[in-house]
């Protein structure tokens, strides 16, 4: 299951893997001309409609800075034994900021099972520096 506003690499992986995908369509924010956040209730309804789903993929924050409620979505996924992968490419700075300012961190702290972060977008690092963080035991590291 993937949000419609995911990075094109997600769609390439779906195609290359010959996977079946069911889409989560975040509402459009017409005032700003961007997609809004993926709502937890929409994820729950989609997983209820497709109980064979193995993974939910979403982007938070989006390129435009829109955040989804990753903690609630992680709880919904985990209650059903579904892996949550969050593309947090534009949120690699959340962990250091959370530690410094004492606020909730990003998708890792919120319980996502796999989190992709692009350090070169928001942190001082070499071009193309990225992390794939494995969190919990739902995702198989192999």
Give the residues covered by each predicted segment.
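Conserved PLP-enzyme active-site core in the AAT-like
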Residues: 1-142
């Amino acid at each position: 299951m993937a949000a419609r506003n995911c990075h094109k690499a997600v769609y390439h992986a779906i195609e290359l893997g010959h996977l079946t995908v069911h889409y989560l369509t975040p509402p459009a924010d017409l005032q700003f001309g961007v997609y809004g956040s993926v709502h937890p209730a929409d994820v729950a309804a989609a997983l209820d409609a497709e109980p064979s789903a193995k993974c939910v993929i979403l982007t938070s924050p989006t390129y435009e800075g829109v955040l989804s409620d990753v903690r609630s979505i992680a709880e919904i996924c985990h209650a059903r034994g579904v892996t949550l992968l969050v593309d947090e490419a534009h949120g690699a700075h959340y962990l250091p900021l959370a530690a410094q300012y004492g606020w909730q961190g990003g998708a890792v702290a919120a319980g996502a099972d796999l989190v992709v972060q692009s350090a070169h977008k928001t942190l001082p690092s070499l071009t193309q520096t990225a992390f794939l963080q494995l969190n919990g035991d739902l995702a198989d590291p192999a």
